[in-house]
Amino acid sequence: MNLLRPKLKYFILAILIIAADLYTKYLANTYLEFAQSLKITSFFNLTLLYNHGAAFSLLSNDQTSWQMIMFSTISLIAAIVLIYLIIKQPITEKINLFSFALILGGALGNFYDRAFQGYVIDFLDFHIGNYHWPSFNIADSAITCGVVILIAASLFTKKKS
């Protein structure tokens, strides 16, 4: 346990992301009408949607049980790999640890939805005029931020010789 103590904050971050994700999805599901946009700004709405597909609603028209099982399994495997990476990553690799925690929290937030509801709740709707970016949620945001940070770190960090 002493080996994990310095990394505890990264697991706490993942748990906080899961909590924020599930709570905001609960609020969206409770207070928003399905597929009805609540205008917040000229470029942002809250719109409750149920995503049976992958990220950004890919494959969402094919609502089969194999698809739910496949996406749930992928999320669970990703979470296990990320937990392993956090445990094995040197404590000095803070950017990687932070990124892994973001991705882990997001993966588990969406896994929960798929496993217990059969779909992921999306509600954040950004748009320019009539062009809408696919709706997403806090978990998707955490995953995206984690991946972008990992890519940026790999591009802009000098390798140790």
From Swiss-Prot:
Q: Annotated pathway, please?
A: Protein modification; lipoprotein biosynthesis (signal peptide cleavage)
The chemistry this enzyme catalyses reads:
Release of signal peptides from bacterial membrane prolipoproteins. Hydrolyzes -Xaa-Yaa-Zaa-|-(S,diacylglyceryl)Cys-, in which Xaa is hydrophobic (preferably Leu), and Yaa (Ala or Ser) and Zaa (Gly or Ala) have small, neutral side chains
Instruction: List, in alphabetical order, the GO biological process terms annotated in this UniProt record.
Output: proteolysis
Q: Which GO terms describe its cellular component?
A: plasma membrane
This protein's membrane topology, according to the annotation, is: Multi-pass membrane protein
Instruction: Output the PANTHER family linked to this UniProt entry.
Output: LIPOPROTEIN SIGNAL PEPTIDASE (PTHR33695:SF1)
Q: What does this protein do?
A: This protein specifically catalyzes the removal of signal peptides from prolipoproteins.
**Protein name, per record:** Lipoprotein signal peptidase
UniProt organism field: Francisella tularensis subsp. holarctica (strain LVS)
Gene for this protein? lspA
